[in-house]
Regions:
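Active-site helix of classical SDR
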Residues: 11
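Amphipathic alpha-helical segment in the mid-to-C-terminal domain
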Residues: 63, 93, 144-148
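C-terminal amphipathic/interface module of NAD(P)-dependent oxidoreductases
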Residues: 126-167
Length: 167
């Protein structure tokens, strides 16, 4: 919640801080959402639309898996607290691009930023967090999600592109 961070990161941290002492509450952390539905908030869509992509490693959350996991936590009366609800494992941007190229065959090359310095000087307004979240607590509560690589693969195989916008 301390600069330099994005408004989103700061407000998220402040929100978690505010409810931390309440006791009977859940914080279900989503990280970089995606699924098979093309759209402006979908990580897989964003990667395809960027003119240049930034190489990093992150945990990701398949939106459908996230919802099912949260409902399972609630239904099973899992202990209150904070849960990292991400598909197990992590992927790099390069791995995601490889799957997009292999499955969707976009017909264009993906260009990566040369290095962090170029990316931050040219494109980023705030620092990017590259994070791999620990899902052990989720697993220990009895909620098992499919590995992130499998969720990405299935989403791309079932990809539903947005219709072109009328001119």
């Amino acid at each position: 919640r301390h600069p330099p961070c994005s408004f989103y990161s700061g407000s998220k941290a402040l929100g978690e801080e505010a409810i931390q002492g309440l006791g009977r509450s859940y914080v279900w952390r989503l990280r970089i959402p995606f699924d098979q539905h093309d759209g402006p908030r979908n990580y897989l869509s964003k990667i395809q639309r960027y003119s240049k992509v930034y190489q990093n490693a992150n945990s990701l959350s398949h939106r459908g898996d996230f919802v099912r996991a949260c409902l399972d936590l609630w239904a099973s009366r899992a202990p209150f607290g904070t849960y990292n609800v991400t598909n197990p494992g992590f992927v790099t941007t390069g791995q995601v691009v490889e799957r997009i190229e292999a499955i969707l065959k976009p017909g264009r090359p993906f260009v990566f930023w040369a290095n962090d310095e170029e990316f931050y000087r040219t494109a980023a307004k705030t620092p990017r967090s590259n994070c791999v979240l620990d899902t052990r607590k989720l697993r220990e509560a009895g909620v098992v999600l499919r590995p992130v690589e499998e969720a990405i693969e299935e989403s791309l195989k079932q990809w539903q592109a947005e219709p072109p916008k009328p001119s």
